Amino acid sequence: MERWWFNSMLFKKEFECRCGLNKSTESLGSIENASEGDEPDIKDRTKNIQSWGGRDDSSYSKVDHLFVVKDIRNFISDDTFLVKDSNGDNFSIYFDIENQIFEIDNNHSFRSELKNTYWNSSYLNNGSTSEDTYYNHYMYDTQYSWNNHINSCIDSYLQSQIWIETSIVSGGDNYSDSYIYSSICGESRNNSEGEVSDIQTHVKGSDFTIIESSNDLDVTQKYRHLWVQCENCYGLNYKKFLKSKMNICEQCGYHLKMNSSERIELSIDPGTWDPMDEDMASLDPIEFHSEEEPYKDRIDSYQKKTGLTEAVQTGIGQLNGIPVAVGVMDFQFMGGSMGSVVGEKITRLIEYATKELLPLIIVCASGGARMQEGSLSLMQMAKISSALYDYQSNKKLFYVSILTSPTTGGVTASFGMLGDIIIAEPNAYIAFAGKRVIEQTLNTTVPEGSQAAEYLFQKGLFDLIVPRNLLKSVLSELFKFHAFVPLNQNETEH
């Protein structure tokens, strides 16, 4: 594979890139005039370029002049970024779009070579000038020390985080958008010693392998009582403020998981929540045999862990003054699996809403039917659907289904998709069978992102994608449109 190596520092202003090219002097001529409209032949240049694998300190000895690349997408396929954290520790980040690798390395020789290149650059020696004011400011003013040069280039990115957003060419005309985000913790990094761990992350429809020092994971675990790590961008969110931000990542806007109590607090007016059937719990109806933890013991452990009796909370409350019947599933309780108790509680909620002529909201978050209860869990699909038929078709009442991540299995195949209005959260994972199950069963590859809310919305699977901060107002408007009014307004009219 042909590889290009760049050491790039991002400017805050206009995101210009200052790059040092690791090249062979035999394959590359002068690059003083490299610009957006005047690009050398990439294929000829790559013949003698050093590869990342099996490198030693001398592999960086051919770093050449610093220059400006204004249109990075037409210039590189593999990228190495030189960065420094808040403690002053330097390391490089290698990004290979073709092999889908994102690697963090602590080799300090790279910085030394680039530093020498900076001071020995032909631009400085020749005293030439450029039309680029930013380039002049950072490159020609020799009163700036090397450290000031680095700090000016990276600035706020290296104090707390790195955010690189660019388009990169991979060996042809196909462009691949890459969004790379990495938190820099306040702990000092060691020199690439110790074990290495692989982490899979989802980046704009692609899976990249992040190879990171195990020390970073230790730091995350050490401060997990203070911070919540985003599962999408791996950014850290201060736990104390996360609840007030509705569990939405401050860095990338990803909707993190919420438990059922938090969702009730988000949507229902304070002081109006009246729970139903709180004491109903499963008694292991088929005496499910398990070689590991018995089913009843597992139920007990989840009850202690979550403070709930089952994987759903049901009750009556008010949404902006409008009385509603609400059921909220909790994925933290056995993956939100639907057993006999979950099905019974939801059925009773629907029957109560039918009797009292209330609008109905069910928030879905489930892995599907609970296997420990066998066919009893499967029959809940038909039981709930039957109750909904009477509610919707006979009584002509209004049911809103809200699909959160993940919503799969029997819930998707029953009441999850029976709403008069079906709303999904952004980036929600919605499917009947999971990706792994499909691939192992059918021996075929499931396209990346084909089970995401945005893709399914384009296919017409549901009606709306609504962020959490707008959900309550959207629900309120929907209910008013269907002639459900707040209690105080109803009393005034009568």
From Swiss-Prot:
Alphabetized Pfam families for the sequence = Carboxyl_trans
Per the UniProt record, the source organism is Coffea arabica
Give the E.C. number(s).
Answer: 2.1.3.15
The protein here is known as Acetyl-coenzyme A carboxylase carboxyl transferase subunit beta, chloroplastic
Q: Which GO terms describe its biological process?
A: fatty acid biosynthetic process; malonyl-CoA biosynthetic process
- What does the subunit comment say? Acetyl-CoA carboxylase is a heterohexamer composed of biotin carboxyl carrier protein, biotin carboxylase and 2 subunits each of ACCase subunit alpha and ACCase plastid-coded subunit beta (accD).
Binding positions for Zn(2+)?
A: C230, C233, C249, C252
Q: Which reaction does it catalyse?
A: N(6)-carboxybiotinyl-L-lysyl-[protein] + acetyl-CoA = N(6)-biotinyl-L-lysyl-[protein] + malonyl-CoA
Where would I find the C4-type zinc fingers in this protein? 230-252
Q: Which SUPFAM superfamilies match?
A: ClpP/crotonase
Q: Where is the CoA carboxyltransferase N-terminal domain?
A: 226-494
The compartments listed are: Plastid, Chloroplast stroma
